[in-house]
């Protein structure tokens, strides 16, 4: 994980829980009753959607391994949004990459792919908006 990726992942985590600024403030939060992600989360990593990741991170926090839990959260965000880099074809546009990664983390691949395709179509790309970025999207 390079410095730019680390910064992007940390910003995504902060957007998920504004009280978290790093390992010392990392916490388990109760989700609202209407939330479909489960009952608990750690910076958007929910027990109902990603139980294995949530349980691993919670166990680290319970054991007092805050730094390791923070690194695990950062890596989780990067691993789960890695497709965005392949869509863009490089790391040359970190601002665009960040916005797409953050959206991907919250809305998934297909919705984020559609946003990218629609944005490119505004500039004349003529892409089919199917949410599956491929070779034409990268061009």
Predicted regions and their residues:
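Cell-wall polysaccharide-cleaving catalytic domain and substrate-binding groove, primarily
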Residues: 1-139
